[in-house]
Curated annotation (Swiss-Prot):
The keyword Cell membrane does not apply. This is Small ribosomal subunit protein uS7c. One of the primary rRNA binding proteins, it binds directly to 16S rRNA where it nucleates assembly of the head domain of the 30S subunit. Part of the 30S ribosomal subunit. PANTHER family: RIBOSOMAL PROTEIN S7. GO terms for cellular component: chloroplast; small ribosomal subunit. PROSITE patterns: RIBOSOMAL_S7.
């Protein structure tokens, strides 16, 4: 048994303008080469575009998009005997949000468009409506987990 203490789970800080943890998580994931001010700029421009497109609170659109993309279950490769099985595992809320943010950013990076703020705003609006690549990724993950429900006992 380890004598070391368990690490405290860090809570995400909130951003200066919206005072929201989700926005800060998004900023930290979009961050490249330590340029945090640029990441904030991209997020705030995307939020402004969401405000213009939907004429609703951009924070509620962001929450709805992340709630829509957050997976309940995922598959994890597990080697049993000589073969590798895709074992379905349940995902906690924090990990689910992190996955959702990663999928949203990945889908927006793949989108054709002028700049990242435009692409991110479009992806967030689509995800809030229930369409888009990030939603497709979640559904695909759920299908994989459902198909491999027979290997659930390998957990």
């Amino acid at each position: 048994m380890s004598r070391r203490g368990t690490a405290e789970e860090k809570t995400a800080k909130s951003d200066p303008i919206y005072r929201n943890r989700l926005v800060n998580m998004l900023v930290n994931r979009i961050l490249k080469h330590g340029k945090k001010s640029l990441a904030y700029q991209i997020i705030y421009r995307a939020m402004k575009k969401i405000q213009q497109k939907t004429e609703t609170n951009p924070l509620s659109v962001l929450r709805q998009a992340i709630r829509g993309v957050t997976p309940d279950i995922a598959v994890k490769a597990r080697r049993v005997g000589g073969s590798t099985h895709q074992v379905p595992i349940e995902i906690g809320s924090t990990q689910g949000k992190a996955l959702a943010i990663r999928w949203l950013l990945g889908a927006s990076r793949k989108r054709p468009g002028r700049n990242m703020a435009f692409k991110l705003s479009s992806e967030l609006v689509d995800a809030a409506k229930g369409s888009g690549d990030a939603i497709r990724k979640k559904e695909e993950t759920h299908r994989m987990a459902e198909a491999n429900x027979a290997f659930a006992h390998f957990r």
